[in-house]
Amino acid sequence: MPYRSAVLAWSLMAQMMGNANWLLTDEGELRQFGSADIESPPQVYRLYHFLTDLDAALEKFEDDVSRVEAIVPLVRKLLVSSYWLQMEYDPPSPKTGWAVKFLYREYQYPLTVQMVTWQPGTPSTIHNHGTWGIVALLGGQERNRFWRRAAEPKHPYNIESTGELLLNPGDVIGFTSDAIHAIESIGDETTVSFNLYGITNYDRRYKFHPESRTAEKF
């Protein structure tokens, strides 16, 4: 695959100027936090190490912002150390334009750990996740557009644009539960990302239709 070589450069890209950790809040505000620089650990930081540390972080912190800020360094540590993860993905489906490969599945395990690919030019719906989330870009370029709720008496699901951000390999973005965004793979390369999500509240997860100022659960 022509895009497989792109993900191998992630650990180097993460050290370069310009890469960053981003956080999108429920209010549609985007801010940078922490450092994108991380050294390879002296011993291999395996997936089970990451999952153990992830459980500890979730037990320690209860709010979305604190959880994202605590977990992003763990994600960077994992991706720098366990190179095999950067190759564990499926090519996008010709029908949908995207593909998902789960990295860890266990009976009643509540979190989602997966690799996601999008073919160039494929957009997502405008949506929130109903839980906190973290996306680390490994290959390609991904445009993120952001919104916030702007409820009106007759249109409780009205939203308004708050900006956009272009993610490059080495960038990581986190979301709070009601942060609203849409993504699109741009350029010539398939977008490859490591995605991590908390426990989804399906009663709070929506895709939005700004033209009609409506939304629906999904």
Predicted regions mapped to residue ranges:
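N-terminal leader/capping segments at the start of a protein or of a new domain
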Residues: P2-Y83
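Short acidic-glycine-tyrosine-enriched beta hairpin
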Residues: A150-D178
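A short glycine-rich, His/Asp/Glu-containing loop-to-beta-strand
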Residues: P91-P120
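A short hydrophobic beta-strand segment most commonly corresponding to one strand
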Residues: I134-A136, A182, D188-R204
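Short beta-strand segments in beta-sandwich/barrel cores
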Residues: P123-S124, G140-F146
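Glycine- and acidic-residue-biased ligand/ion/polar-headgroup-sensing regions
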Residues: T131-R143
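Conserved short histidine dyad/triad with adjacent acidic residue
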Residues: Q114-N128, T176-D178
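Residue-level recognition of short, solvent-exposed, well-ordered loop/turn junctions
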Residues: Q119, L138, L166-N168
